[in-house]
A protein has these predicted regions:
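Adenosine-phosphate binding glycine-rich loop
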Residues: 1-16, 113-184
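Glycine-rich phosphate/diphosphate-binding loop of Rossmann-like nucleotide-binding domains
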Residues: 1-89
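Functionally constrained cores in energy, signaling, and assembly domains
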Residues: 21-22, 42-43, 48, 52, ...
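Generic structural signal for well-ordered, non-membrane alpha-helical segments
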Residues: 24, 28, 71-74, 78-81, ...
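Rossmann-like adenosine-cofactor binding region
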Residues: 66-134, 139-141
Length: 184
């Protein structure tokens, strides 16, 4: 929902953006999977993790879920794939996104640095090099907190009320669209 609304504010088309994520665990891959279903082309998604860029032929720290996003590239590090990125989605570790990398992102970049307790980059670090960036973190003491607490209780309440035994992708997408609409 936050990325959908951020793209509206930035005047960007979801089908044309380049997304770079730092983190390839369950949270990151679930987010990326949903963003692809919402309209970001899979070929525009660049996933990085502790071993670097998820690329075709990589064996270190790979699994079938990551392999879906493997790119044909010689790039091996986050700093090599961040150029012209419209969206950075951080679900990894503090300090991995550097100000010099932010400088190389596309105009009006969306930077969601969600690692806790230390985000991938702080709002102050972003603002020191870009005044056109939209930044959110997972912390309540910084502006623009992004927190999954907005959706979990209500998805479960809706599932219980409907007698559902599974949370489906359709339910997740409905939650995304509803939260995006409410947060505009």
């Amino acid at each position: 929902a936050a990325i959908m609304n951020g793209l509206k504010v930035a005047g960007k088309d979801m089908s044309k953006v380049k997304l770079v994520t730092s983190g390839a665990g369950a949270a990151a891959l679930a987010c990326v999977g949903l963003l692809v279903k919402l309209g970001i082309p899979r070929e525009n998604v660049w996933v990085t993790d502790l071993a670097g860029v998820v690329y075709e032929g990589r064996v270190e720290l790979m699994d079938p879920d990551k392999s879906i996003y493997a790119q044909k590239t010689d790039a091996r590090k986050l700093g090599e794939v961040i150029d012209n990125a419209d969206v950075f989605l951080g679900l990894s570790a503090g300090g991995v996104l550097k100000a010099e990398m932010v400088k190389r992102m596309a105009p009006n970049p969306i930077i969601f640095a969600l690692a806790n307790p230390t985000p991938e980059i702080t709002p102050g670090e972003v603002k020191s090099v870009r005044d056109d960036a939209i930044i959110g973190t997972g912390r309540s003491d910084y502006p623009n907190q992004i927190n999954n607490i907005l959706c979990f209780p209500y998805i479960f309440r809706g599932a219980l009320d409907a007698g559902a035994t599974t949370i489906t992708v359709e339910m997740e997408m409905a939650a995304v669209h509803t939260i995006a609409e409410l947060a505009q």
